């Protein structure tokens, strides 16, 4: 069975698409589904229009740390 978290494994709404939620998801062996947007030439993780304080797609890949987990991107 494949388990995907939605915007990371968050415990409060403020954690959605934040580093802590992605670390929690990946550390438990869950993949994740999230959204990518572009702002000022960078790809960032954001469900809504980016505000400039989002983590970058590159940072998300660093959090994955080479783990072979599903990553569903919209």
Tell where the protein language model's regions lie, with residue ranges.
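Phosphate-group recognition and catalysis centered on beta-loop-alpha active-site segments
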Residues: 1-74
